[in-house]
Amino acid sequence: MTDKLATLQSALEKALGNRIQSLTEAVGEITLVVKAADYLETMRTLRDDATLKFEQLIDLCGVDYSAYGDGAWNGPRFAAVSHLLSVTHNWRVRVRVFAPDDDLPVVASVVDVWNAADWFEREAFDLYGLVFEGHPDLRRILTDYGFIGHPFRKDFPVSGYVEMRYDPVQRRVIYQPVTIEPREITPRVIREDQYGGLKH
């Protein structure tokens, strides 16, 4: 760990204390995990504390950990992951908060802390079904009106549930249940012995 990261780690531990569930360093960046109950207050502290001053939210995304690693994940399924930047101190931190309920994943919105979180949270809601409590306009942002489900969840079928096609009789685009025929996605290619001048 570099001196700069050690200084940041010390400042985080001092400012946040027992709100830190875990703090790890990997690939030159610190990842902080906090409980959902402490999330909003932690984010305010990260922005307002003079020793930290994370003025900018760079990114916020959802993650579905149900098939993480070797598929034997045993923790909460959904998390919101934020990347913060301190322009003043020139350092970054990643903050992860797990939603306590897998069936209805809810975490606090940080739109009141960084207004840049608005569309990021809408995207995580749309694609993962993460509900951000206190968000001023939590509605879908990428999928179509009436879309059913959340397409980035690991249990969402790759083909989806409905498909869209043009109906020449009705002269408009219609939705219908997905009709998929079993097919080989990667064709088996058998090359001749002397293919490309190579000898086997």
Swiss-Prot record:
It is a peripheral membrane protein. Pfam families: Complex1_30kDa. It catalyses: a quinone + NADH + 5 H(+)(in) = a quinol + NAD(+) + 4 H(+)(out). It is an enzyme of class 7 (translocase). NDH-1 is composed of 14 different subunits. Subunits NuoB, C, D, E, F, and G constitute the peripheral sector of the complex. Belongs to the complex I 30 kDa subunit family. NCBIfam families: NuoC_fam (TIGR01961), PRK06074.1-1 (NF004730). This is NADH-quinone oxidoreductase subunit C. The lineage of its organism: Bacteria, Pseudomonadati, Pseudomonadota, Betaproteobacteria, Burkholderiales. The gene is nuoC.
